[in-house]
C-alpha cells in the first residue's frame, strides 16, 4: 500500500525513439495535483485505489476504511507501508481485518506497489497535458488505474516478488 502524486507537473520518463534523434516532449506548467492511494493483492492480482486531494492521517483513514470494505469477508490483509507520517500516526484508525507492516526505512524495493506507480507513470500519466485543472488530474488518475485493472494479469506480474509467498507463509 502506498500513494502517488499525480499532477499537471508530471514526471518525464524514458521512451524508445529513432536512434540519433530526440523526441519532443510536452511539459505542463500547471500545479494542480491529487494523490492516488492504492493497495494491491499480488496473489489474486486485484487492487483498490482512491484518489484524494491530500496526504494526511484523515485521508489515510478514508482509504483504510475503503480497503477494509473491499477485503473479502473472513479474510485478513497485511499491508506493506513505508514510514510516512500518516502511515505511522497514533491517530490512525486501522480496521480489524487489516494489519500494517512497516519495512526498514529507505527500502521501497520491499513494497510491491512501488512498481505499479512506475508502470502507471510510464504508460498513462507522463508526456501529456492535463488541461482542465484539478478535475482533469483526478480523471487521469482514475483512467490510469482502471486501465491497469483492465489488463489481465498485469497487477500480478508487477507485484508478485519471488520472496513474497514464503514471507507471507512464515508470518
Regions found by a protein language model. Name each.
Residues 1-65, 166-171:
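Extended, low-complexity cationic-aromatic segments
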Residues 5-7, 55-56, 77-90, 105-110:
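Acidic, metal-coordinating catalytic cores used for nucleic-acid/nucleotide bond scission
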Residues 12-13, 91-93:
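Short amphipathic alpha-helical segments
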Residues 22-30, 96-115, 129:
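RNase H-like polynucleotidyl transferase catalytic core
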Residues 58-78:
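Short, basic/hydrophobic alpha-helical segments
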Residues 74, 93-98:
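Short, well-ordered coil/turn elements that cap or connect secondary structure elements
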Residues 81-83, 101-123, 137:
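RNase H-like two-metal-ion nuclease catalytic core shared by retroviral integrases
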Residues 114-171:
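C-terminal anion-handling pockets and recognition modules
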Amino acid at each position: 500500500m502506498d500513494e502517488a502524486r499525480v499532477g499537471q507537473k508530471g514526471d518525464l520518463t524514458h521512451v524508445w525513439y529513432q536512434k540519433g534523434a530526440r523526441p519532443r516532449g510536452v511539459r505542463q506548467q500547471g500545479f494542480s495535483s491529487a494523490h492516488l492511494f492504492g493497495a494491491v493483492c499480488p496473489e489474486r492480482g486485484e487492487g483498490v485505489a482512491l484518489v484524494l486531494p491530500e496526504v494526511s492521517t484523515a485521508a489515510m483513514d478514508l482509504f483504510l476504511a475503503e480497503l477494509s470494505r473491499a477485503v473479502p469477508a473472513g479474510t485478513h490483509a497485511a499491508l506493506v507501508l513505508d514510514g510516512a507520517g500518516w502511515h505511522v500516526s497514533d491517530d490512525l484508525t486501522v480496521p480489524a481485518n487489516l494489519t500494517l507492516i512497516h519495512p526498514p526505512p529507505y527500502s521501497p524495493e520491499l513494497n510491491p506497489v512501488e512498481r505499479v506507480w512506475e508502470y502507471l507513470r510510464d504508460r498513462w500519466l507522463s508526456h501529456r497535458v492535463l488541461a482542465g485543472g484539478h478535475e482533469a488530474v483526478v480523471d487521469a488518475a482514475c483512467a490510469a488505474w482502471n486501465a491497469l485493472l483492465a489488463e489481465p494479469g498485469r497487477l500480478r506480474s508487477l507485484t508478485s516478488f519471488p520472496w513474497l509467498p514464503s514471507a507471507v507463509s512464515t508470518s
